[in-house]
């Protein structure tokens, strides 16, 4: 209340006792190298911070006046609510130290489907909130197309190798584990391609 915030949120983080795969998934979802830092609560992220349902607070009267979460949305309802907060002129603050340990799916096929649905939801969000899709949301789709093209171009494969190497180095440094670093390559590619595929699929069907 002392901050004057109408709504607030914080980053998601990995607890030290998370499994290696949980830490790798967290890296894929929060690193600047993968999502532009928009989920990690970084002031240097590529998009304005928007609270997500796993770490969000809002004044009750404001929540009710906006109608709460959209019940007709299966995915992306928290971002939809955050966008409505901004459209309403609410004061939304990021509390960088108010992190939540967020356990995500560690089964790669389920993780792929989860991020694929997030990519699909982005198209729905753009339909509801024109102009809300930023460059960072297009990057996974571009990456997905690039991966397909790189299969036939040697320098493309070289660039993907350098990107994977960057993920390995950064994640290993953050997690103090080369094993987590290696897993982060897998989870990062899964995250980007899954989201990109869902984004492209929904865009073509819209």
Please provide the spans of the model-predicted regions:
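Short glycine- and hydrophobic/aromatic-rich loop-to-beta-strand nucleating segment
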Residues: 48-61, 67, 74, 79
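Conserved donor NDP-sugar-binding/catalytic core segment of glycosyltransferases
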Residues: 1-31, 91, 97-99, 103
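Membrane-embedded multi-pass helical conduit in multi-pass membrane proteins
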Residues: 143-206
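Short, flexible, basic/aromatic active-site loop/helix in glycosyltransferases
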Residues: 10-16, 25-49, 53, 64, ...
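A generic structural signal for short hydrophobic patches within well-formed alpha-helices
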Residues: 62-63, 100
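Basic/Trp-rich segment in TM-proximal cytosolic loops or flexible interdomain/linker regions
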Residues: 109-161, 178-181
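Catalytic donor/gating beta->alpha subdomain of glycosyltransferases that bind UDP-sugars
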Residues: 70-133
């Amino acid at each position: 209340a002392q901050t004057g915030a109408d709504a607030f949120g914080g980053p998601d983080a990995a607890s030290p006792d998370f499994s290696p795969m949980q830490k790798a998934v967290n890296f894929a979802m929060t690193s600047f190298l993968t999502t532009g830092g928009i989920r990690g609560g970084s002031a240097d992220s590529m998009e304005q911070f928007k609270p997500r349902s796993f770490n969000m607070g809002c004044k009750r009267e404001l929540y009710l006046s906006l109608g709460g979460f959209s019940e007709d949305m299966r995915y992306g309802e928290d971002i939809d609510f955050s966008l409505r907060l901004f459209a309403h002129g609410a004061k939304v603050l990021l509390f960088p130290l108010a992190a939540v340990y967020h356990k995500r799916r560690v089964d790669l096929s389920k993780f792929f489907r989860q991020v694929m649905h997030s990519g699909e939801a982005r198209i729905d969000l753009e339909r509801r909130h024109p102009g809300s899709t930023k460059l960072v949301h297009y990057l996974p789709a571009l990456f997905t197309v690039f991966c397909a093209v790189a299969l036939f171009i040697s320098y493309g494969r070289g660039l993907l190798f350098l990107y994977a190497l960057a993920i390995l180095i950064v994640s290993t440094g953050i997690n103090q584990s080369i094993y987590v670093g290696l897993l982060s390559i897998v989870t990062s590619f899964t995250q980007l391609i899954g989201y990109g595929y869902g984004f492209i699929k929904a865009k073509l069907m819209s």
